[in-house]
From Swiss-Prot:
UniProt GO molecular function: proton motive force dependent protein transmembrane transporter activity
Lineage: Bacteria, Pseudomonadati, Pseudomonadota, Alphaproteobacteria, Rhodobacterales
Keywords: Cell inner membrane, Cell membrane, Membrane, Protein transport, Translocation, Transmembrane, Transmembrane helix, Transport
Keyword set includes Protein biosynthesis: no
Subunit structure: The Tat system comprises two distinct complexes: a TatABC complex, containing multiple copies of TatA, TatB and TatC subunits, and a separate TatA complex, containing only TatA subunits. Substrates initially bind to the TatABC complex, which probably triggers association of the separate TatA complex to form the active translocon.
Example of a GO cellular component annotation carried by this entry: TAT protein transport complex
Record protein name field: Sec-independent protein translocase protein TatC
Major localization listed first in the record, in broad terms: membrane
Amino acid sequence: MTADHIDETAAPLIEHLAELRTRILYALSAYVVAVVLCYIIWHPVFTFLTHPICEALAARGQACQLSLIKLQEGFFVAINIAMLGGFALAFPMIGFQLWRFVAPGLYRNEKRAFLPFLIASPVMFFVGAAFCYYIILPMAFSFFLGFQMGDVVAGADASDPANQMAVIGFTGSMEEYLKLTTKFVMAFGICFQMPVALTLLGKAGLVSAQALASVRKYAVVAMLTVSAIVTPPDVMSQVIMFAVIYPLYEGSIFLVRRIEKKREAQMRAEGTWIDDDEDDEA
């Protein structure tokens, strides 16, 4: 191999690295700007995140109050909101920079096949996060608050022997509440990526609807394991997570089956489809 040939092959690599550097800088710049913006408005963001717990407490006639257990807790809550919120805010820009880096190396038909999944991924994440925030969190918090005891509960009769016991009431920590809420929201957002990921694999021919259906029982075990890992360590949270993930898995099978039928119809029209029976005879 001559020196000239080495130089010719090295040039495209250097160009790719330069392009990668440019895209990373754009993505990081967008993230930094988003982090600064979210830090400035961290208090309204945190107030928005407390709506589910405040509504659950209000339904029980209790005041909504979260405490600073540690002196530095408020600062770290603001930092966490800035970092997580900044990533969520900058995610479309990060995805766009990823696409700008990958797209030049794809054929036109590959771009048409891949672009819908690139758009669907953040959309499904935000759908999962919204589903968690507006539906799952109110249900979960109402369930958890049901374990309060004593006259802290609105309408409880203090003269009732059943209420003459140690008062067990909710005294929330800002940091712990943020951790719990973001863990729920992120978990549901990530789990809502399942149809996107499996459909993309089906589009690429790496998985089939029949294969996904045949490993359903193993998938159930995997879903239960994931539910136990990504949710708080209580049965109710894990059951809620599994009840959402499983329909997504079945929906993924349906989408992959539709892709397979569309591919088969196209190949039959082109005369390139080979039936299994014909393949066996050959």
